[in-house]
């Protein structure tokens, strides 16, 4: 009996230590991904950057995160996780994440020609992106294993909150270490690569802690007589026909389209948020940075509350409409509110943050209600696949808008025009999101047997 009590499975402190080892790589991943979000203003004037990138280059670089995910990386690597286990495959992709980040850091530090540095950084971002996504899946699966039967929702909520705190930290810290200069002054490579160096250092710490977790997890399985591989019954094994079954479900397609349009309205907006808020509302860089950092802080605060609300009262499709409407209204305010009035910036970002917390709380729990359990893995993979298509395309397009519109350094009229044209993209996406949310609402009304709008039992 004493041996049973001393196993890692039954040691709550060991479980929380394992969680501590798991959250740092995710914090670092989110930090590195958003390290340039509050510095996007720099890319408006490539002639003042030793790096030489313009906004189109920045948008292209940002899209690299999703490239390998689009081309089957998520689905294939998810199958590898099931077959070979979290410790082996997770370690490979944590390593890929760190290597990709190191390649990006090298590319923006080595003094290459802009086209060369962009190409190398794009390859690095592709590797970093796929590594981060699969590392995230590995972390989620590991938390589910270690916290089975005890505080699993709390552990997963803490992991997500700390990861999103990585985004907020990057947004707040980057302008502090790359200080704003007078118009026309040059930003050297040794200045613009500082966020990447810090992000890479945190990723390295995260990789070390992942290795600690792997050792703990191996001992966990040895004590419990289990394996980190997934044993799948013959009838539940993946078949390509499952993809068609999922894609032929109209309500699944609605959720997938809502997912890609809604998330692009928020996540891809963050990549250019400072460059949009500065000219439209006349705020300084510190205020614009603070506004952008409000978005992840809102999700940390409100997502668990809205999740509990959906569980308690149901009405998931209605909450999706409300959240989508808030995000669309936010972009309408940013675009059409009187310019130079900072109060509208605070209102719009607050609405964006609340909407960003509300829709996922209602959307993700709806998927198991419309897809059979044995196809859930395929369904979630397909949602992420479709989402990454938008995540790849939107920053490229928005980056080209800024590069096309801004041809003179410090031309305020051009900066306003670019910000407005970029916002039109996000408004269009928001209109599609709310239209699809309405379609899902009426589909739920016509199909009450799906219980989409019923509270959790």
Description of each model-found segment:
Residues 153-179, 384-395:
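Glycine-rich segments within core transmembrane alpha-helices of 12-TM secondary carriers
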Residues 36-41, 249-299, 303, 394-395:
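Extracytoplasmic gate region of multi-pass secondary transporters
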Residues 63-79, 293-306:
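Central cavity-lining transmembrane alpha-helices of secondary-active solute carriers
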Residues 2-11, 220-255, 457:
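Juxtamembrane intracellular "pre-TM" segments in multi-pass secondary transporters
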Residues 316-363:
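C-terminal transmembrane helical hairpin of 12-TM major facilitator-type secondary transporters
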Residues 82-94, 311-324:
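Cytoplasmic membrane-interface "Motif A"-like loop-to-helix N-cap segments
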Residues 124-162:
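Cytoplasmic helix-loop-helix junction between adjacent transmembrane helices
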């Amino acid at each position: 009996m004493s041996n049973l009590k001393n196993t890692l499975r039954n040691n709550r402190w060991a479980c929380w230590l394992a969680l501590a080892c798991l959250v740092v790589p995710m914090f670092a991943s989110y930090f590195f991904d958003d390290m340039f979000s509050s510095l996007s203003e720099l890319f408006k004037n490539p002639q003042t950057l030793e790096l030489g990138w313009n906004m189109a280059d920045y948008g292209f670089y940002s899209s690299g995160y999703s490239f390998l995910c689009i081309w089957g990386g998520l689905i294939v690597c998810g199958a590898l996780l099931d077959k070979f286990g979290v410790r082996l495959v997770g370690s490979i992709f944590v390593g890929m994440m760190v290597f990709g980040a190191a390649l990006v850091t090298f590319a923006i530090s080595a003094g290459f020609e802009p086209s060369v540095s962009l190409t190398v950084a794009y390859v690095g971002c592709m590797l970093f992106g796929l590594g981060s996504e699969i590392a995230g899946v590995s972390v989620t699966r590991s938390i589910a294993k270690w916290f089975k039967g005890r505080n699993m929702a709390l552990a997963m909520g803490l992991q997500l909150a700390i990861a999103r705190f990585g985004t907020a930290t990057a947004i707040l810290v980057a302008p502090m270490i790359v200080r704003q200069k007078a118009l026309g002054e040059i930003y050297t490579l040794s200045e613009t690569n500082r966020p990447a160096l810090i992000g890479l250092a945190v990723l390295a710490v995260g990789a070390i802690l992942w290795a600690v977790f792997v050792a703990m997890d191996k001992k966990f399985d040895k004590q419990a007589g289990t394996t980190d591989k997934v044993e799948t019954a013959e009838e539940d094994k993946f078949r390509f026909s499952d993809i068609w079954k999922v894609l032929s479900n109209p309500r699944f397609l609605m959720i997938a389209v809502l997912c890609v349009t809604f998330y692009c309205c928020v996540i891809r907006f963050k990549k250019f948020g400072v460059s949009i808020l500065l000219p439209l509302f006349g705020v300084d860089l510190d205020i614009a940075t603070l506004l952008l950092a409000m978005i992840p802080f809102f999700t940390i605060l409100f997502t668990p509350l809205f999740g509990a609300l959906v569980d308690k009262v149901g009405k998931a499709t209605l909450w999706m409409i409300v959240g989508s409407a808030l995000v669309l209204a936010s972009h309408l305010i940013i675009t059409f509110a009187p310019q130079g009035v900072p109060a509208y910036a605070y209102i719009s970002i607050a609405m964006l943050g609340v909407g960003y917390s509300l829709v996922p709380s209602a959307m993700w729990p709806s998927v198991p209600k419309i897809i059979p359990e044995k196809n859930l893995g395929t369904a979630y993979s397909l949602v992420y696949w479709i989402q990454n298509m938008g995540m790849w395309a939107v920053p490229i397009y928005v980056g080209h808008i800024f590069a096309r519109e801004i041809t003179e350094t410090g031309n305020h009229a051009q900066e306003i025009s670019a910000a407005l044209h970029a916002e039109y993209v996000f408004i269009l996406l928001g209109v599609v999101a709310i239209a699809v949310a309405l379609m899902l609402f009426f589909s739920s009304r016509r199909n009450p047997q799906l219980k989409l709008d019923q509270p959790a039992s």
